[in-house]
Amino acid sequence: MSYPAHVTDTVYRYDGTFQGFLCCIFESYSRKEIPAAVCAHDRGQISFYDSCEIVTDPARAQRVARGLERLGPTVKERITTGFLSDDPEHELILLRFARICFEKGPAAARATGDPDICAAFDLERAVNNEACKYIEFIRFEQRDMMLGTVIHPKNRILPLLRGHFCSRLPDEDFMIFDATHGIAMLRRNRKVQYMVMEHYDKNTGQEELDWQKLWKRFFDAVTIEQRRNERCQMTHAPKRYWKDMCEMALLGRGTAGKAKQNAKAAR
């Protein structure tokens, strides 16, 4: 889709915050240009292009945020959700998407035949899909008078997990640690905060291990060996999630599998 702006060889560098990204959109709009790339400072990418430092200005960010509100929930959610992506080009994709929607109106978000619109749609879908998977597969353990767990997502999905688990566990304190990005979501006394965290020590107490063993035993007990289909299982629960699911640990594949092996040996 054509832009009322020229594509430059300039790289926008910003502080990595969502407010800072909104300021990148503002800068692009005011300069009537599309940058060659948009990079957060902490990524430290080497580029042969000229760089433009984008200073985070809350007033400018608020103006862009109000503009996104006027464009409607589809455009706004695609940008806010897509920003959680770990795709190295997600900022540029979303900036181009925002420019199109500001110029053409909210209906442009449905023009998925356009490569820029389609790329933004794919970002949002990938982030939402991963969040939905983790909502299904997260396994909490009891620790320090609260529930805790560690996950290894590709994208920064903690904000998308917040609503579900706060609603599902209204009276519980809990922590979800994103080991990939070193961020934890802590809910305590019905208040949620995000904090930088380097390491999560799993509960190795005997009581917790006994509960996990019972869950593994249940998982094995309900397995129907004649209908075991690991290819289908991996379609619904991809292997990359298994290390965070206690029933899928190597020790958890035991009871039914051993019974099958024993039956074969008996023959």
Name each model feature, range by range.
Residues 39-132:
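Charged, alpha-helical interface segments at or near domain boundaries
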Residues 173, 184-191, 203-267:
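Long, compositionally biased intrinsically disordered terminal regions
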Residues 2-59:
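N-terminal ordered "arm"
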Residues 1-7, 262-267:
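Short, low-complexity, intrinsically disordered N-terminal peptides in bacterial proteins
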Residues 20-31, 95-103, 163-167, 213-220:
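Short, hydrophobic/amphipathic alpha-helical patches that form generic packing surfaces
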Residues 53-60, 191-204:
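Acidic, Ser/Thr-rich peripheral helices and adjacent loops at domain boundaries
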Residues 106-199:
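Internal, well-folded beta-alpha domain core
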Residues 78-82, 179, 228-234:
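Short coil/turn segments at secondary-structure boundaries
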